[in-house]
Amino acid sequence: MENKKVRIFDTTLRDGQQCPGAGMSFEQNLEYTQLAMEVGVDVLEAGFPSASHLDFEIVNTIAKLYGCKENSPIIAGLCQLREEQIDTTIEALLPAVKFKKAMLHVYLPVGIHLMPASLGERADDKQGLIKDVYNFIKKAADAGMEVEYSPEGYSQMGENFDFVTDTIRAAVEAGAYVINCPDTTGGACSFQKNNYFVDDMKKHAAIIAKEYPGRDVIWSVHCHNDFGLATQNSINGVFQGPARQIEGCFNGVGERAGNVSLEQCIMIIKHFAKELDDKNPFYTTINTEKIAKISDYIAKNMLPRQPHFPITGYNATRHSSGGHTNAILRNPLAYQPFDPKEVGKEIGIVFGPLSGGNHARSIIERCGYVCTEEEKAEVAQHIKDLYSQRRKGITDDELIRGYLDYRAPIKIEAFDYSKTAQTSEVKLKGKFFTFKGDVREVHEGKDSALAALKKIIDKYFGPVEVQSHRSKSDTSGITAVSVSKITIADELGAVYEGSGADQDIEISAMKALVDAVNKAYIERNYRKKN
């Protein structure tokens, strides 16, 4: 039975970092290598050793540290078809050779526009180039390298088809194991019919299979995304062509519009390959649950990721619409094509203007509070009204603050107080437990207005003990605001802290006491019992 494993060739450290603004430090290259090993890529292209001393050092260090590990990927280095670059790349990869974990990836421009622009007069000496392909690849193969040959600009080769055929022959004859067929400029499209590069791959694969029977050659695709077709072209290379390796970058980073997104290809193969052949489908050996981790690393350290980016984008598994969230709360796959846990993510439900009562209730109950079927719509509307200017949605913590505001038994619209030598009086306007309107209380003694407020609270709620009271100004000057913290204990000994702020220190303390009592009341009456 044919082995239909599709190798994943990760060029994030090479092609990905060639994108302006995407470069990482030496240490970050090593950190990324560890993540690539955890996710299980088959080949990691660590860089272009001839580009600079630092690039050489990065590739060489990765080859030393990871080439010896049993579960590490093959470590690849890229070079042009130039002997000095071949030698430098071999030297950089030598630490991984004895573990059979070293790949030299060499390319030659063959596109009708690319070839003369890149090679100059050398482009006219096609026979000389074919000889160089053979000689330099043989040199690398004899040094113990696995060799990959890329005819750069393959999808735009046009009239160079026969020349490209000869270079592939020379590469295979010299010992190349992988023939990679790049859509270098991202201009390939299946509408090209007979000029489509996947059809050319099939022709070349047939020629090599006929001329080198029994030779194990892996065909590979390397697609750029300039027309947004990189994923389709890469998958076509596998599903409709001879490709058994996909080259690309996680998050689709890379030159210009980027390389193909590896995570998209991996998940498409996982979910759709069986539609072609359910008995022996194409597959990868990627640990998909680690995909989110490596994707997040790239988004943090290379280039930001679009929120709506497929598979790993921040919004790819988040929902807000009321109808959607209602369905997802019953069945996560109602509005998801796959379980986000497959790639190491969780479904997120963001409460926003279009969210409904079921959504609010699910968050409230998950946070340990009571929300009944009868009141869920009213609770949701209260929270929406409270955050009416937050059209992009609110966090779960903000939603809970809205819920607590809905439950609060004391809501004071206006505080007023007065003091004499022997009394303090407080006047409140608003909601005070079951009473709405004006509340007045006089306290005999030299205590502050806070004592009068506590006297009212003890009547309606039950006695509370003020255990601590701290007030301080947030700034200096006459416009400073007093910030108060008050800790209370109820009859059962439960402790709650409230906070308040006002330019009037007495009112800031009263606000803090109200906040603490509200918390105590809600915990006592609306906290779910285990």
Regions from the PLM with identified roles:
Residues V6-I8, Q18-D42, V59-L65, E83-R215, ...:
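Alpha/beta enzyme core
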Residues A494-E497, A501-K529:
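Mixed-charge, glycine-accented linear interaction segment located at domain edges/termini
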Residues C68-C79:
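A glycine-rich helix N-cap at a beta->alpha junction
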Residues R14, P49-A51, L78-R82, Y107-G111, ...:
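Active-site beta-loop-alpha junctions enriched in small/polar residues
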Residues K5-V6, D10-T12, I269, A273-V439, ...:
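A mid-to-C-terminal "edge-of-domain" accessory segment
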